[in-house]
Amino acid sequence: MPPKKGGVTKSKAVSKKAAAVPTPKATPPGRRKSRASSVQPGDPVPQGKKRRYRPGTLALKEIRNYQRTTDLLVAKLPFARLVREIAMQFRPMDEEMRWQSQAILALQEAAEAFLVHLFEDTNLCAIHAKRVTIMQKDIQLARRIRGVWGGAGWV
């Protein structure tokens, strides 16, 4: 059937503002809209994001590195200052003590060996408590088990 002539056609009432604004197309999730690039010719090449390791990976890498080396871990000058400061408490004020570098080096080697062994025992205490994180109570237990002098257990 053909449309009737002279009839009134119905049209939707639309405001002028709504008709003027085009509807934006929705971007699918996971995609970003491309922006006009602000990079000009001759600019340096942008560096990519710095590599992010999983938690614990770098710690294991450091552990392997420290186990491989035999270097001293505490800086020499601060350790020497500490040794001199402690020694001053046992001497009269008018007497000055002189230290050979080999004597301070021997003290530092012994101190670091003591600390390494203490942390090994502390780690064993933490593992015994079914933990991987060492705590103050683990250090206290390790020192208590070692005894008064707390010497290296392997000597």
From Swiss-Prot:
User: What keywords are annotated for this sequence in UniProt?
Assistant: Centromere, Chromosome, DNA-binding, Nucleosome core, Nucleus, Ubl conjugation
Instruction: Tell me the segments the record calls region Disordered.
Output: 1-56
PTM comment: the record says: Ubiquitinated. Is degraded through ubiquitin-mediated proteolysis when not protected by its association to the kinetochore.
Signal sequence segment: none
Q: Where in or outside the cell is it found?
A: Nucleus; Chromosome, Centromere
| InterPro entries membership | Histone-fold, Histone_H2A/H2B/H3, Histone_H3/CENP-A
Q: How does it assemble?
A: Component of centromeric nucleosomes, where DNA is wrapped around a histone octamer core. The octamer contains two molecules each of H2A, H2B, hH3v/CENPA and H4 assembled in one hH3v-H4 heterotetramer and two H2A-H2B heterodimers. Interacts with the inner kinetochore.
**Family label:** Belongs to the histone H3 family.
Q: What does this protein do?
A: Histone H3-like nucleosomal protein that is specifically found in centromeric nucleosomes. Replaces conventional H3 in the nucleosome core of centromeric chromatin that serves as an assembly site for the inner kinetochore. Required for recruitment and assembly of kinetochore proteins, mitotic progression and chromosome segregation. May serve as an epigenetic mark that propagates centromere identity through replication and cell division.
Q: What is the name listed in the Swiss-Prot or TrEMBL entry for this protein?
A: Histone H3-like centromeric protein hH3v
Organism, scientific name: Neurospora crassa (strain ATCC 24698 / 74-OR23-1A / CBS 708.71 / DSM 1257 / FGSC 987)
